Regions:
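Long, domain-scale regions corresponding to catalytic signaling modules most often appended to membrane systems
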Residues: 98, 116-216
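Interfacial loop-to-transmembrane junctions
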Residues: 259-274
């Protein structure tokens, strides 16, 4: 999927103005996705349009009477609204307000590019709007693209966020208040599923670690008490318990605690070692 800074939605009848606007945006360093093809509707073509909207940070709609008469333009706008994209309505020609069925356009401040407006001033306003909270908007786009891919793959866990990507998503989500556009339901579900997946993976890795510690302690016990039994005194064997007992206590604690946690396993191991030490120091002399 191609990522872009701007997707321009427009009526073909407004192409001369759109070409001027596009050239100005490109000259300003913006990556613009725009469909110049005047071809009949097809599923392949519409998939390309849909993916371009999914992968853009800002959706600019060129408002005019012809825009609202175009089925394609209205369909593009519906997709942008559904994905919770940042939409910048750009007024090119005055139109009958009753022809606008979009609530999002009605609620957002427009950038005016009509014949009576100064293009340079309007363009400066447009650039400022595009650049507002740019890090947030780009994160929103990246997250949406990955969330859609995860959804299209039937929520396959191999498409989850992990490591630094998950930490970044959690950090951005924590600071979402006051940001536009807000995360949509799919994006939130994707972060939540990634968190759950990361927790499951961590538990699985910890179980493997604990099992390895358990095997180590058992091997040590076998070596000390079976292979070396004839060569060691009872006192020596008791003292050698410090070789295998910590690992055994750590492994059993880690595997049996309700939540797998290195910290909890270490605490449990410490408690066992203290109790054993007290037993050894206080009672061994009487046995």
């Amino acid at each position: 999927m191609v990522l872009s800074d701007v997707f321009i939605s427009y009526s073909r009848k407004d192409s001369p103005f759109v070409e001027t606007l596009n050239n100005s945006l490109v000259s300003g360093g913006k990556k613009v996705w725009i469909d110049w093809k005047d071809i009949p509707y097809s599923s392949k073509w519409w998939d390309e349009i849909s993916q371009a909207i999914e992968g853009t940070s800002t959706f600019i709609c060129i408002l005019s009477p012809d825009y609202f008469e175009s089925k394609t333009c209205n369909d593009e706008l519906v997709i942008a609204e559904k994905l919770n994209k940042r939409i910048i309505p750009t007024l090119y020609k005055e139109f009958d307000p009753s022809s606008n069925s979009s609530n999002s356009i009605s609620k957002i401040n427009w950038v005016h590019f009509t014949a009576k407006d100064d293009f340079s001033k309007s363009f400066s306003t447009l650039i400022d709007t595009i650049n507002k909270d740019l890090d947030w908007v780009r994160f929103h786009t990246r997250l949406l693209v990955r969330a859609l891919e995860w959804s299209n793959k039937k929520n396959d866990s191999s498409y989850h966020l992990y490591g630094q990507d998950l930490q970044e998503a959690q950090s951005f989500q924590k600071n979402e208040a006051g940001k536009q556009p807000m995360l949509n339901t799919l994006q939130k579900n994707y972060i939540e599923a990634s968190q759950s997946g990361a927790a499951r993976l961590q538990r699985k890795q910890l179980r493997g670690f604990y099992i390895a510690a358990l095997i180590y302690s058992i091997v040590q016990m076998v070596v000390i008490y079976i292979w070396s039994e004839q060569d060691l005194s009872e006192t020596a064997m008791i003292k050698l318990s410090w070789v295998w007992l910590p690992a055994l206590a750590f492994a059993i604690a880690g595997l049996t605690l309700g939540r797998h946690s290195i910290k909890r396993a270490l605490i449990a191991m410490g408690v066992v070692m203290i109790l054993f030490f007290l037993f050894f120091e206080m009672l061994w002399g009487y046995l």
